């Protein structure tokens, strides 16, 4: 039923909150410090101190095998996490582990360093296997920051793009519609 699903989502959200609250500031909690079926993590301070923005975190999550949650809505510089009832505990734990690992990466960055692991994310297979590697971190750190990725890696097909430009200049790379009609 709907009530059962809502309870499950709230339980999952509370679990995630408990796992990551030492590493991320959570906005808009209730009187008892709880969040409902979604939470907003505040990433704004990282920009000033480390030069890392919410989009850098979102792009790095791709290297960990996760599609980035909603960013900068409803609050600019934040990330909204909404676990669904279909996500099992193992997947939620992997997601929390990824966020905690990313926080550890953030604090190694400096404000003026635009050539760090987060700013270069996501890392494609083509990038990682190229002859040239001009980064101050290893290929393993880029591709396999946590051990579960060694046996279950999802590779991004593109590296960092200008999101605003891409949103304004969407170009379909599909075959012409006639090719699909023939088949």
Show which residues each predicted segment covers.
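Single conserved hydrophobic/aromatic residue that forms the stacking wall/gate
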Residues: 1-11
């Amino acid at each position: 039923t709907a009530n059962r699903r809502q309870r499950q989502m709230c339980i999952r959200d509370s679990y995630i909150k408990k796992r990551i609250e030492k590493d991320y500031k959570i906005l808009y909690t209730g009187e008892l410090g709880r969040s409902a079926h979604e939470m907003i993590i505040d990433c704004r301070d990282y920009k000033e101190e480390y030069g890392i923005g919410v989009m850098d975190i979102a792009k790095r999550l791709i290297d960990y095998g996760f599609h980035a949650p909603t960013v900068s809505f409803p609050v600019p510089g934040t990330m909204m996490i909404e676990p669904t009832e279909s996500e099992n505990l193992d997947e939620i734990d992997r997601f929390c582990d990824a966020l905690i690992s990313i926080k550890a990466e953030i604090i190694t960055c400096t404000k003026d360093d635009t050539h760090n692991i987060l700013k270069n994310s996501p890392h494609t297979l083509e990038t990682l296997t190229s002859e040239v590697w001009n980064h101050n971190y290893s290929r393993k750190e880029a591709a396999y920051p946590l051990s579960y990725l060694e046996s279950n890696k999802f590779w991004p097909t593109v590296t960092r793009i200008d999101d605003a430009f891409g949103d304004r200049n969407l170009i379909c790379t599909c075959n012409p519609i006639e090719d699909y009609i023939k088949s």
